[in-house]
Amino acid sequence: LIVEPLVLGAGGMLMYPASVLAELKKITEASGSLLIADEVMTGWGRTGTMFACEQASISPDILCTSKGLTGGTIPLAVTLVTDAIFRAHYSEDRKKTFFHSSSYTANPIACAAALANVEIWRDEPVAGRITALSVMQAVGLQRFRDNPYF
């Protein structure tokens, strides 16, 4: 099952609660299928946590991320998988190699930008700043709460 966690960007920015994402994870586990989270748009703090899946307290089997990985400076994409999936595909034998490539991987400049971004997330209070901004925005939006045109 492939999902955009919490925000269906391709569907016109439709939001759904974290409880739905948690239930989807239960369904995939019960059916023996994989949950693939497309966090290209939702990752790197855009939903309030580093990854939207965190809000449902779930770990997808496969997580795809891009855009925010480099702080939006240069294209780079990454696909993260569980250890079990990686081990099932990894081999020194070229016939069983874990092929992982695309047009947005391995650019040294993009990788340097991503590393700098990861260091910022590690060393600076980015999550705290996101929380503070979220609270400030929520307070500011309260005046529109009862406005039927907003």
Question: Model segments located where?
Answer:
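Conserved N-terminal phosphate-binding loop of PLP-dependent enzymes in the Aspartate aminotransferase
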Residues: 2-150
